[in-house]
Amino acid sequence: MASPQINIDEILLQAQGADENQRSLGMNALKNLAQQNLSSFLTILGTILSNESKDPKIRILSAIVIKNSLLYSEDYRKKWKTEISKEEKDKIKLLILSTLASSQKNIRTMAGTVISSICKIDTPITETWPDLLPSLTNNAFNEDINMKLSAIETLGYVCEELNMKSIDSANVDKIMNALIQNLIKGENTKQVILQLLKALSYAIRLAQKNFENKNERNIIMNSIFQIGDKYQTDEDVIEKIAMLFIEMLSISSYYDYIEEFFLQIMKFSFGIFDKYKESNEKLALFALEIILSVGDEEVSRINYDFINLNKIGNGNYTLDKKNRGYFNKISPELQKLIEQNVKLPDDDNEDSWNISNACLKILNLMSQLADSNTMHKFYENLSNEIKKNNQGQNDINLLNNRAKIWLLLGSCIARVNITDIAKILNSNIYLIFDDIRQNISMPLKKSASYIILKVTKEIPKMFDSSRLGKIIELLSAEIKASQDNIYMANLCRSLQNLIKCYGDLETNKSSSSLSPYFEIILNNLFVGAEQDIKNYQASAKTTLSRFMTIGTLIEYSSHDKQFQISQIIKQFLIQIESTQNNIDTMIKAGIDKETIFQIQEYYFSLLQKLFNKYKTKIELDFADKIWQLTEALFKYRQTVFDEANLAMSALARNMGETFEPIFKKYYPYVEYSIKYYSNNSLSKSGLVSLMHCIISVQKNIDKTKDIISTLIDVCVSNEVEKKNKTIAISIIGYVAMFEGTNFSIYIDPVMKLLFSAAQMGFNLGYNIDEELIEFVKTLRFQIIQTFTCLEMTFNNKENNILNSYMKDIFEFLKSCINDTKIQNLEILKSILSLINDLFGIYGSQFKELCNENFAAGFIKLIQGYFTNKQMDPDIEQNIEILKMFFIQNN
């Protein structure tokens, strides 16, 4: 590693350069160095990072490479844990830790992030790096300001990466003590205070036990309030305190301990809102988010009337989910806040997070949490305001007043306490309809459509048979013509809600069926969407809204109506083709390329829905036109996109074997997608599409060698997402089945891959998360399924190519059965089926591996899943078959 040390600076700069080719060369060079000797590589980078005489840019790059190597490479993480000695790790850690004494702030910060990255993968930190926390907590009191700041900052980063399983309460005590004692000290600079508050925001997640103790809780909260009082005019400090309260109140358990501090927290929130709402909207919004955190917690609690298991980090604590009514205590102040700060949105901020929208969300929470008397008075005031402003459709002031009333009323509509709301709505529903029809005030149209959206979502039965036709005609007529994003989204989502509620599109028997209105809905959606596609002048969002509504129609419609929808979609295809041929001209005319691409993607999403639901096979000529368009889009965009892959996948499932000629043309694009490892979503869509194409066509279209090579590359690549690897393994089984005994030439590399993958998940230790457990379960299931496919392919006892692998296959199955930590019924069911198949082929020969005692224990394990419920008939039948094999062979 001597020569790499000489030019590592140059390689680091090359890997971060502007030129793509040079950058790729640099990244590959770094990768090669890491693969040759990871320990030496990290030591060199640590030495660069700690060297004060080095160029700061080089030092920062070295920190980034260390961090990314450990956080984002599964292979390097594994080597760190299993191949690098404790002495080598300690040397690397010491180099990084020493960098916290750097005179340069950005270098200290980068060192802190590297330390936290090591803490994330090297747990429990008190065992793997026992000197770290004592060093940081001691240096938090260091007289050297730079050392003090870097220690506090790093404590925060470390706490961000830790959870309740990776640190004990004694060390949390030490961290909290270092932060709080520093906070209490009067001589700290503002810079130190800001760093302490930031670190405390991360550490508070771990301080459950500290908060349960009343004395400690008082010290923590009072120290925060004292800082707030001292720095009440300093926006930076106030912002950090607000963020700390938001973090604290987002953790369910803390809600149960804030009663004595609640009004003080609210006083802080209302105070900074009033002070900064005109001059600092960001800070004012933080104040409202503190209030929202309390309301969100209480709304979640009204859905529980039992002791609920709440998770903090990865630690489990049983908490009383009682709603303590904090929100109701401040309802008068909230009502005043709402009345003064809700404003009609303008075009620039209507869908953004702003003070008015935050107040509307607070109103929604208040309508669910405030006592009935409070809300009854609020609704009475709204009713009176409606009466004052319900005359005249030409007075813009009256219309805008009504628009604000509808915004307020719509925000109150929720699944609880709707009696008063329903009365107001019933007496004013036709006024709301009129406000949607009028064309003087767009804000009024939008707020009225917002009311309709909320009603169709929460109380759709309000539109009974007498109103259903009117609302459908109104919505579909407006959808036909509108080009406003928000308004269109409200209308289309309202229509989708009605389709889902009244979507009895297969019969006209129900008086509340949408079936009589199907033609109106579809035709109006088509006219509007056709204009979008033809002109590409609307925002892609309006087209998406229309397409999503057509998609909902597909899901809830009968077969004959799906046929009508398919005819509409064919017409869309003609329009898409036409615009595709004129894209360059349209772009020159000023139409945004991304808008064009988005609408194309939405169209393919619609195709996917149709092909998934449509029972009649798509004709080959229509399918070929879809393919031609797909290929044209691929070539023009110089890439493949997920939605097109998934649409082709759905088309293959619809067409079955008749899809073969298209599959042959489509395959190169599938392969391209799969190999695009840097985009896991695209790679996944390619894998899914390949699987469905092979299953549908039931052939490998003379591409078996290429397919197997691609799938093996997917499984061994470090760049590929774990879930994509399980899909690749499952595809191998299907390829084998359709290739038949000719697959024998691939059996050795495939079995090597499967047995290598099979080792994953064993000896994981105790520090594994739920996500990893679920992945290993899926992986094992897919490996077993692939073994089953191979067994079905080579099912001749004589000269069976699997004979030499039989013992290893069975050992894997036994390991899965014995591993109770990572096990489920689906895995056991697939094992049972495979064992029966193997008995069927090998008979007494297989009995040498699977003896009667083992089989009896396996059966008992499966039966344990059905102690309190009836056994699945398939499992019951397979158990009897397994028993019969032993009877026959005795």
Tell me the role of every PLM-derived stretch:
Residues 1-890:
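Karyopherin-beta/Importin-beta family HEAT-repeat alpha-solenoid scaffold
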